[in-house]
Amino acid sequence: MKIVVLGAGAWGTALAVNAARAADAGVTRHQVTLWARNAAQVQSLQAERANTRYLPGIALPESLLLQGGGEASLAHAVSGQDLIILATPVAAARGMLQRLQHVTAPLAWLS
């Protein structure tokens, strides 16, 4: 199953890390992507393989894919996914749901 977690704060990062670890351990066969709205944050996540701002001390598994920044990257991130997990702050949820209104994959909204 292909899963994308939208929102690279503490909650989204923790969910993505645990899903990727489960896949790495052979518990699941998921391919997990973590999407951040800010391209600079994605670069930091890739360089450090950690979310030092929101989830310090937790390493990002090498299997965890990282994407982000802009409308094109959001469209690419959700394309072909089997499950989309929306893990953004409540203040951002309305805007994200509007941007995702034409997506047909199942969506889990966590707040």
Task: Give names to the regions the model predicted.
Residues E62-L66, S79-S111:
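Rossmann-like NAD(P)(H) cofactor-binding subdomain of soluble oxidoreductases
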Residues M1-I58, L65-V78, R99:
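NAD(P)+-binding Rossmann beta1-loop-alpha1 motif at the extreme N-terminus of oxidoreductases
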